């Protein structure tokens, strides 16, 4: 450096001060690049993963709902690569969330149900019942620990990660998070306060990461719009003018409540000048059709193989990096882990079956997506086929649904297993009599007309593809 500075002095006698200044800047910059490359290294992408809970795919302003107010989600959609025809792999919270965090199907990560098996005649609130439940949940937690997770993979590249909201698999560290709110309860204990009482834990975590110059992943999975549907009275009053059902008004109100928290997060990123450095990802864990005359969900939504339980918009936003726009391609929550890893400069493991949604060639080349639905309470924690209710796939305009009882090769005694679990007779009869279903979801988005009988060759072709995918 000293020799260069002496040369700079000779330039001073022969040239203008402006020229000298320019040469000095070049010398200093070259020295810094040589000695301190970390000063000019590109910043790593941060990730904010937003997961709503029990949310129907059409209940957003940007998806065309005429009553539900979602201005902040609408903004996110405008600024995102939007996939309105997204799907989750399973229509139940626990297995769906496990897929999002691992990038693997439920039959791969083995978390197929919400709760572990029950024993005939043993209530969960009895000492024996509680022991069975705790032991079963521990086995489910171990399954997750044995599967690489998104936070664990990011940690290898120096990322800090923060779990908030819904989290079923024990202490947050068991999922690979470096920090978190959940200590081990079924839904998420302390984590469930996020979005309902405060957003401050997220702001504090991000500030901590900035102070330590660490890239971060935030898992924001509030129990919203999931029940209890208890929005503020003014919101309920507004929606009461739009529907005769108080239950629907409260559900819609919880969606608006969730939307406001999304606005809080986007505004926070703007204030902290983090928007361009942060990939924002949105998905819901499963669908929901609110019952009109009682709390709870209506048929053909949660826990079902229909779009009311499976479909979700998926959004990816990073201003200056991702071009906003809309894609009508069918995509899946199985794609989120490889997409996030790729956006962070990390090669996804070959074992992940999803595609990078930011690679248009891979999105358009894929011809079908797959999924599976299981019982709410497990029958067997080690063998996914024991809990299977339906397998399904989407290829082009067609959606195939295959009940477990319709496939002897996969599940010969499904009905007997259901009977052993003491399901009510009407449910067992309905399941035993289930048939293969085929829907043209482009022309029949509500899946009302089963075309399976009139298209036997198509059903046969799709069944072969579904069987080739299903490898428990």
Give the ranges of each region predicted by the language model.
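Active-site-proximal N-terminal segment of extracellular/periplasmic enzymes that hydrolyze or transfer
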Residues: 40-81, 90, 434, 446-457
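Short, structured active-site-proximal loop/turn typified by the sulfatase FGly-forming signature C/S-X-P-X-R
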Residues: 65-97, 103-109, 160-162, 463-471
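A short beta-strand-to-alpha-helix junction
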Residues: 65-69, 87-92, 117-119, 139-148, ...
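Histidine-centered active-site microenvironments of extracellular/periplasmic hydrolases
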Residues: 68, 268-325, 332, 353, ...
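Polar, surface-exposed loop/tail segments
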Residues: 70-71, 100, 166, 276-277, ...
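Catalytic-site neighborhoods of secreted/periplasmic enzymes
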Residues: 104-204, 299-301
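Active-site His/acidic residue clusters
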Residues: 202-251, 286-299
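C-terminal, low-complexity/hydrophilic appendages and adjacent surface loops
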Residues: 303-308, 375-452
């Amino acid at each position: 450096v000293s020799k260069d500075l002496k040369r700079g002095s000779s330039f001073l006698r022969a040239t203008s001060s402006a020229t000298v200044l320019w040469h000095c800047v070049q010398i200093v910059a070259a020295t810094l690049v040589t000695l301190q490359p970390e000063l000019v290294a590109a910043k790593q992408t941060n990730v904010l993963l937003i997961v709503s809970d029990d949310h129907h795919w059409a209940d957003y302003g940007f998806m065309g709902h005429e009553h539900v107010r979602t201005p902040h989600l609408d903004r996110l959609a405008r600024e995102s690569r939007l996939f309105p025809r997204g799907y989750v792999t399973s229509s139940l919270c626990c297995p769906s969330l496990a897929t999002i965090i691992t990038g693997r199907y439920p039959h791969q990560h083995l978390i197929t149900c919400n709760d572990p098996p029950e024993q005939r005649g043993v209530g969960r609130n009895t000492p024996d019942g509680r022991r069975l439940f705790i032991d079963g949940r521990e086995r489910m937690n171990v399954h997750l620990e044995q599967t690489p997770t998104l936070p664990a993979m990011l940690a290898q590249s120096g990322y800090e990660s923060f779990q908030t909201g819904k989290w079923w698999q024990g202490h947050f560290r068991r999922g690979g998070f470096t920090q978190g709110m959940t200590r081990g309860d079924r839904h998420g204990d302390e984590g469930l306060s996020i979005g309902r009482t405060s957003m401050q834990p997220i702001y504090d975590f991000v500030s901590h990461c900035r102070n330590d110059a660490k890239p971060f992943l935030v898992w924001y999975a509030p129990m919203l719009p999931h029940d209890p549907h208890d929005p503020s009275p003014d919101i309920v009053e507004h929606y009461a003018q739009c529907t005769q059902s108080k239950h629907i008004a409260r559900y819609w109100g919880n969606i608006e409540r969730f939307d406001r928290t999304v606005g809080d997060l986007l505004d926070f990123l703007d204030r902290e000048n983090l928007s361009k450095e942060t990939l924002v990802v949105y998905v819901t864990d499963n669908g929901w059709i609110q019952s009109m005359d009682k709390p709870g969900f209506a048929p053909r939504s949660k826990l079902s193989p229909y779009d009311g339980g499976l479909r979700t918009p998926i959004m990816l936003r990073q201003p200056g990096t991702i071009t906003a726009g809309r894609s009508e391609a069918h995509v899946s929550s199985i794609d989120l882990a490889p997409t996030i890893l790729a956006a962070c400069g990390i090669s996804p493991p070959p074992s992940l079956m999803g595609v990078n949604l930011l690679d248009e060639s891979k999105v358009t080349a894929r011809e079908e997506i797959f999924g599976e639905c299981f019982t709410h309470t497990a029958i067997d924690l080690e063998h996914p086929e024991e809990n299977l209710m339906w397998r399904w796939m989407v290829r082009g305009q067609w959606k195939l649904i295959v009940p477990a009882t319709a496939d002897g090769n996969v599940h010969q005694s499904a009905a007997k297993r259901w009977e052993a679990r003491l399901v009510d007779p009407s449910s067992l009869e309905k399941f035993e009599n289930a048939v293969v279903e085929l829907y043209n979801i482009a022309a029949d988005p509500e899946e009302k007309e089963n075309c399976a009988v009139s298209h036997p060759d198509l059903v046969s072709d799709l069944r072969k593809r579904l069987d080739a995918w299903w490898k428990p």
